[in-house]
UniProtKB/Swiss-Prot annotation:
This is Large ribosomal subunit protein uL4. Part of the 50S ribosomal subunit. One of the primary rRNA binding proteins, this protein initially binds near the 5'-end of the 23S rRNA. It is important during the early stages of 50S assembly. It makes multiple contacts with different domains of the 23S rRNA in the assembled 50S subunit and ribosome. Forms part of the polypeptide exit tunnel. One of its GO terms (biological process) is translation. It holds the Pfam family Ribosomal_L4. It comes from Rhizobium rhizogenes (strain K84 / ATCC BAA-868) (Agrobacterium radiobacter). The keyword Ribosomal protein applies. The lineage of its organism: Bacteria, Pseudomonadati, Pseudomonadota, Alphaproteobacteria, Hyphomicrobiales.
Amino acid sequence: MELNVKTLEGKDAGKVSLSDAIFGLEPREDIIARVIRWQLAKKRQGTHKAQGRAEVSRTGAKMYKQKGTGRARHHSARAPQFRGGGKAHGPVVRSHEHDLPKKVRALGLRLALSAKLKAEDVIILDNLVAADAKTKALAGAFETLGLTNALFIGGAELDSNFKLAAANIPNIDVLPVQGINVYDILRRGKLVLSKAAVEALEERFK
């Protein structure tokens, strides 16, 4: 499969061949969903915490005598049914991470790339290089290309001017090829790959 290559100025810069093993798969929502759940679970801090009845600062003495009052039997005011009592089965500090086989993660990435290409949301640029770290100039180039919501994937080393200039543009993300992931691909409208990124992906999955 061949796609046209463009420059940041919108000019043609030849063609590039894309591997069907990476960009030509039939998308599977179940695999993609599993990978995204795995990614988001890893990102969770897990620092949520509620005090249980053993942890609240309150006397543990019996509230009133057992018999003779006509009221319900109670012991400590730390019990969860009372205002200020401990939370029953509340959240505790923990890790939300879970395992996902490496082969499934790799397949999920190829499926996400294939889904973007099938939706005609993949653009190939010859390189991601900016002459100056000027946001205004780069934003104008993106507007010319019709890129208002996009993920840019460069080579192993990003051009510092391009990265700095793109940092202040809303809805634009820039990552090196080793940072490419399913969640970021799907959360942005367009996927913009440099020729170096395409070569690195094909080397990674061959």
